Amino acid sequence: MTAPASTQAATLKRFISAWEKWDAQEWISTFSDDFQQVTLPHSLSVPVRTRKEVEIVLPALVATVKSYQLQIHHVIHDPDNNKAVVYAASTGKLPWGDWNLEYAAFLTFTDDGGKVARLEEMLDTAFLQDFGPKFGKYLEENGGPVAVAAGGKQDLRSEA
């Protein structure tokens, strides 16, 4: 049974709003307890992340990318199948250069429509192949994701 379209639409709106604000905690609050994040394409061999793993990595990412701006290009909501798709691009500043990433985010809602149960993200592989190792090194050099996130409590949308 699918959730009412209005419930899914409200969840989708909260998800996009948190993403636009670049607010990790608000974004995570839209995820179900059994949430899964899948990075696509599968050829990148990025393991599926659980909510607990995302709760560690996402705040560190948000703290690392400054002056974040998101541009939503398309949103498609398919309430009959409990799904939505968002095509977006974002820009920002990293400690080592620019952040320029395109996304196609495929969301699956919980049965009641109140949370996002699964997020499958098709990412710009050229950017990701460069970013991934540099982000890993940055986290390692700065005490890990929890330490990076803790140091990023200032206004994350402006230059620090």
Swiss-Prot record:
Cleaved signal peptide residues: none
Class of enzymatic activity (EC top level): oxidoreductase
Source organism superkingdom: Eukaryota
UniProt entry tagged with the keyword Oxidoreductase: yes
GO-annotated molecular function: monooxygenase activity
Any Pfam family the entry gives: SnoaL_2
SUPFAM superfamilies tied to this protein: NTF2-like (SSF54427)
Applications reported: Secalonic acids show unprecedented anticancer activities against various human cancer cells and might be interesting for further derivatization, targeting diseases such as cancer.
Annotated family: Belongs to the avfA family.
UniProt function note: Monooxygenase; part of the gene cluster that mediates the biosynthesis of the tetrahydroxanthone dimer secalonic acid D. The pathway begins with the synthesis of atrochrysone thioester by the polyketide synthase AacuL. The atrochrysone carboxyl ACP thioesterase AacuM then breaks the thioester bond and releases the atrochrysone carboxylic acid from AacuL. Atrochrysone carboxylic acid is decarboxylated by the decarboxylase AacuI, and oxidized by the anthrone oxygenase AacuG to yield emodin. Emodin is then reduced to emodin hydroquinone by a yet unidentified oxidoreductase.
Entry protein name: Monooxygenase AacuO
